[in-house]
């Protein structure tokens, strides 16, 4: 896989100044703005619609397992299908060289939640090679726009009810379609492709003007390929989400180990796995969010470094957005500001969602001791595991704070448990307790306080009560 990307950067030789026109779709040039930067030096003319053979495959609650192929060229196929003109339409758009499995999985999950028109776009004939796919996505984007235009004119269907979900090159393809349809409802970019799109004009790539609301999930972002990323680091939506920093996802292969062992065959295999894993996380996160409306809360921050340092655990009274399907519920979703970068952490395996808590504990006791303090928070049904809050010198009267990412959503906090464990060579008989614990969590930053007057020996559980 890496070789394809490198060839894409190094290959030159396409002539300039040509134009091709296709009935229904209009004309396409190979000049500006597609030749404005080095990263688009390979631009050429897109293939004909007949050669690409874009297909629209409809799934609904009436046919969740077997698609109906519908066509704007023959609108009677739409009329004869289960397409509902009173329903929202979500179109899943794959990127380069994709077999369509994630699209089918996406429709399957969406239809568990909603009675919608779920359409998978098949343009595999035009996307088997990356360089051709970059050029062909303009024609395919025009095909999507033509499809929506037919819905508008023949079925009085509002473009505001259309949501395009595009992965990799499919994100920019969605942007091309949106730029042709004023009032398009929403575009979700899933790790938009970087090569040939980094630092390009907005006419070339996905940007906030392409729909009423554009949200983006970055999972393998880089400024250049050799940063080991095939997505773009650039913000290109109203809300841009950078889970785990947006570059390398936990659970994806480590490239360093085989390289240090000089096992280059293993390294080549790991490289392909690395790109595929990180790039795919974007649609995996989105799919998981569909049935978890309270998951993937994200926080505004200048950088992931600052987020990890605990400097960005703040939501305004309007709350923080959630990454994924329910991002459009965010109050400020249409405001493109400098604060549109949002960060969060995920797990390394599915279920990926994590719920962030800020835990502050004030210790009580008589003497300083050496050990580790653990807290566990619980709701009406579930509890988190134990989280280490502080380790080392434990001083009564001091307050210690830690941000933790829980793998369960406990909802409203109803209980807090405290336990401390002394260090191996600590032989004192000291007792410690949690005088007060403050938990801050949720998209609105809810605070809850728990208290106790007890002090306990090591390894003895202390239960705190609301106060």
UniProtKB/Swiss-Prot annotation:
- The glycosylation sites are 74, 125
* Gene Ontology BP, a term: fatty acid biosynthetic process
Q: Which domain of life is it from?
A: Eukaryota
S-S bonds? 21-27, 107-118, 252-277, 301-312, 315-320, 451-467
Q: Which reaction does it catalyse?
A: a triacylglycerol + H2O = a diacylglycerol + a fatty acid + H(+)
Summed up, the tissue specificity of this protein is:
Overexpressed in hepatocellular carcinoma.
Keywords recorded for this protein, A-Z? Disulfide bond, Glycoprotein, Hydrolase, Lipid degradation, Lipid metabolism, Secreted, Signal
Q: Which InterPro entries match?
A: AB_hydrolase_fold, Lipase, Lipase_LIPH, Lipase_N, Lipase_panc, PLAT/LH2_dom, PLAT/LH2_dom_sf, TAG_lipase
Please verify whether the record's keywords include DNA-binding: no
Q: Where in the cell is it found?
A: Secreted
In short, the EC number is: 3.1.1.3
Q: Which residues form the PLAT domain?
A: 355-467
> What's a Gene Ontology MF term here?
phospholipase A1 activity
Point out the signal peptide segment.
1-17
**Which positions are catalytic residues?**
168 (nucleophile), 191 (charge relay system), 279 (charge relay system)
Give the record's GO CC terms.
extracellular region
* UniProt similarity note: Belongs to the AB hydrolase superfamily. Lipase family.
This one is known as Pancreatic lipase-related protein 3
Q: Which gene encodes it?
A: PNLIPRP3
């Amino acid at each position: 896989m890496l070789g394809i990307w490198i060839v894409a950067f190094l290959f030159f030789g396409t002539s300039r100044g040509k134009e091709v026109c296709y009935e229904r779709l209009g004309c396409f040039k190979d000049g500006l703005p597609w030749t404005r930067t080095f990263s688009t030096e390979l631009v050429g003319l897109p293939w004909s619609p007949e050669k690409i053979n874009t297909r629209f495959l409809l799934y609904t609650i009436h046919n969740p397992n077997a698609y109906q192929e519908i066509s704007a060229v023959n609108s009677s196929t739409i009329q004869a299908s289960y397409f509902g003109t009173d329903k929202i339409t979500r179109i899943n758009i794959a990127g380069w060289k994709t077999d369509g499995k994630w699209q089918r999985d996406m429709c399957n999950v969406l239809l568990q939640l909603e009675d919608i028109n779920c359409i998978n776009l098949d343009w595999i004939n035009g996307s088997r090679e990356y360089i051709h796919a970059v050029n062909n996505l303009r024609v395919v984007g025009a095909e999507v726009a033509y499809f929506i235009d037919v819905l508008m004119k023949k079925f009085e269907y509002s473009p505001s009810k259309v949501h395009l979900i595009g992965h990799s090159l499919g994100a920019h393809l969605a942007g091309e379609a949106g730029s042709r349809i004023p009032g398009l409802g929403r575009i979700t970019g899933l790790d938009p492709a970087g090569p040939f799109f980094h630092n390009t004009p907005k006419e070339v790539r996905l940007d906030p003007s392409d729909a009423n609301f554009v949200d983006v999930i970055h999972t393998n972002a880089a400024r250049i390929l050799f940063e080991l990323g095939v997505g773009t680091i650039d913000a290109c939506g109203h809300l841009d989400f950078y889970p785990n920093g947006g570059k390398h996802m936990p659970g994806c292969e480590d490239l360093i180990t085989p390289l240090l062992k000089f096992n280059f065959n293993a390294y080549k295999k790991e490289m392909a796995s690395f790109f595929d894993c990180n790039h795919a996380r974007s649609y995996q996160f989105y799919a998981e969010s569909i049935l978890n409306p309270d998951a993937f809360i994200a926080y505004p921050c200048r950088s992931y470094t600052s987020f990890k340092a605990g400097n960005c655990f703040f939501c305004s009274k309007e709350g923080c957005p959630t990454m994924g399907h329910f991002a459009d519920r965010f109050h400020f979703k249409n405001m493109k500001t400098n604060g549109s970068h949002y960060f969060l952490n995920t797990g390394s395996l599915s279920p990926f969602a994590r719920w962030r808590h800020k835990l502050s504990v004030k210790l009580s006791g008589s003497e300083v001791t050496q050990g580790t303090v653990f807290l566990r928070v619980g709701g009406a049904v579930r509890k988190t595991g134990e989280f280490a809050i502080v380790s080392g010198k434990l001083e009564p009267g001091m307050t210690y704070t830690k941000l933790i990412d829980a793998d369960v959503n406990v909802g409203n906090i109803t209980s807090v448990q405290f336990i401390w464990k002394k260090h191996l060579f600590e032989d004192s008989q000291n007792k410690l307790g949690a005088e007060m614990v403050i938990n801050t969590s949720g998209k609105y930053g809810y605070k809850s306080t728990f208290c106790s007057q007890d002090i306990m020996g090591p390894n003895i559980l202390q239960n705190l009560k609301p106060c």
